[in-house]
From Swiss-Prot:
This is Ribosome maturation factor RimP. InterPro entries: Ribosome_maturation_RimP, RimP_C, RimP_C_sf, RimP_N, RimP_N_sf. GO terms for biological process: ribosomal small subunit assembly; translation. One of its GO terms (cellular component) is cytosol. HAMAP family: RimP. Pfam families: DUF150_C (PF17384), RimP_N (PF02576). The lineage of its organism: Bacteria, Bacillati, Bacillota, Bacilli, Lactobacillales. Its main location: cytoplasm. The gene is rimP. Signal peptide: none annotated.
């Protein structure tokens, strides 16, 4: 769930995202190593890949917008980091898991508490609903609620 600053930035940049037919995968505003970082992860819909040219164009437009909008949504100094989500993209929202299931991708899940003696599980999403998922692993099917999942990422096999 986005905080107030994140939501304000999302609202401001949404028209740019739509104009470029991009997909906002994630947006965070955090403190890292003593500095504030606004991180925007972009992709293309329908399992297409975003290009460096796409990211460069988007960065220029967002920089200009955030530098000129009044009131300034982020009045303090910060680093703007715009990139693709990458092969090991984070899975945070229900639609992220739907995307991974639709693409038949492997995911890596870290649990808060071990289940069947393990805190980390790798597999494909067999079933998915608003409360959780069933992961097909080498040990069989493992039902998990989203409350049990500490972190999930795409686990692309090369």
């Amino acid at each position: 769930m986005a905080n107030k600053t994140e939501q304000t930035v999302i609202d401001l940049i949404s028209p740019i995202i739509e104009a470029h037919n991009d997909l906002l995968w994630d947006l965070t505003f955090t403190k890292e190593g003593g500095q504030k970082v606004l991180r925007i992860l972009l992709d293309k819909p329908d399992h297409q890949f975003i290009t460096m040219n796409d990211l460069t164009l988007f960065t220029q437009e967002v920089n200009e917008l955030l530098d000129t909008v009044d009131p300034d949504p982020i009045p303090e100094a910060y680093v703007l980091d715009i990139s693709s989500p990458g092969a090991d993209r984070p899975l945070k929202e229900l639609w992220h898991f739907e995307w991974a299931k639709e693409a038949n991708e492997n995911i890596l899940v870290s649990l808060f508490v071990a289940k069947e003696g393990q805190k980390k599980w790798q597999g494909k999403i067999a079933d998915l609903n608003k409360d959780g998922l069933t992961l097909t692993t080498t040990n069989g099917r493992l039902p998990l609620t989203f409350d049990e999942i500490a972190k999930a990422i795409l686990d692309v096999q090369f």
